[in-house]
Amino acid sequence: MERLLLTDRTFSGDILQAIQGVASILQHHGAMKIILYGSLARGDYRADSDIDICVEGIPDENYFRALAECLMKTQRRVSILDFQNIQGDFRERILKEGKILYKRE
């Protein structure tokens, strides 16, 4: 899995802004690691694609608050999954195609 540099020209302005906003909110809520997966990570996204995020480290009591804040800030569909709850082929696919947005060192 590679680290995605959000300062490059991978995404158009509004999508980049939305991804940065989501990552910032999740960091604020205690995320230890944030992974972008799905069409945005693969590069085959459309203008209306949702933001698929896999996260580690957000306490259960903060999860829904973080999700609500992400939805309000971005005005686009956001899917946030806890990496600890993902298994099998889906987990392997995220590890293979995912791009690390943030990792607490």
Where are these regions (language model features)?
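Glycine-rich beta-strand-to-loop/alpha-helix junction loops that act as flexible
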Residues: 37-39
